Amino acid sequence: RQRVESSNAKAKAQISDLQEFVRRFSANASKARQATSRKRQLEKIKIEEIRPSSRQNPYIRFEQAKKLYRTAVTVEGLSFRYPGADNDVFRNLNFTIEAGQRVAIIGPNGIGKTTLMRCLASDLTPTAGRVTWVENAQPGYMPQDPQAEFEAKMDLFSWMSTWTGKADDDQLVRATLGRLLFSGDETKKSVTVLSGGEKNRMMYGKLILTKPNVMLMDEPTNHMDMETIESLQIGLEK
């Protein structure tokens, strides 16, 4: 879709330039042949039709239960080595992330991006150093592989209900599931049979309901279709 939109934009600009040339010089004897040539070029330019997708877009919006100000987390002398390994995955990392900052961890596979994320999320204990979140920080973590989140024998509705904190929030749970394209009998199926993309959508639901003021997302577009990726991008920009 993006390729077609870009191509169409260039074609429209070219059409505009050619039409302007023809308008200005078609009556000019010295430019008549060039104007005729431009008309022929115009006839050959085509604008591709962009057909609307038949797939639905989930509705993804994230809120914060508590607003976070100033510093969110401070990392000091952070090192990590897996048991039995000869080398550290990373060593002596020091950085501070402020509230409102958007930070991307970029690097080749195997460099330790996920390990660092897990240390920040308290999913792994660092070999040395410390991660200090401010008192009001409420991190929400979306792991690269959320399989461990879906091993319990629960249906989708029951799983999502565990993140509301209230026993009478059935309507909120159903609305959240619906916005993530789970409805009707589908909410009664076991979370253990979900596809990778469906698990990710359920994880978005967890973050929507728990309302963290810091989000740690490790490759959150894995297994996702373009409609969901676009919806996630919109949700993160709000």
Where are these regions (language model features)?
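ABC ATP-binding cassette signature C-motif
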Residues: 1-6, 61-238
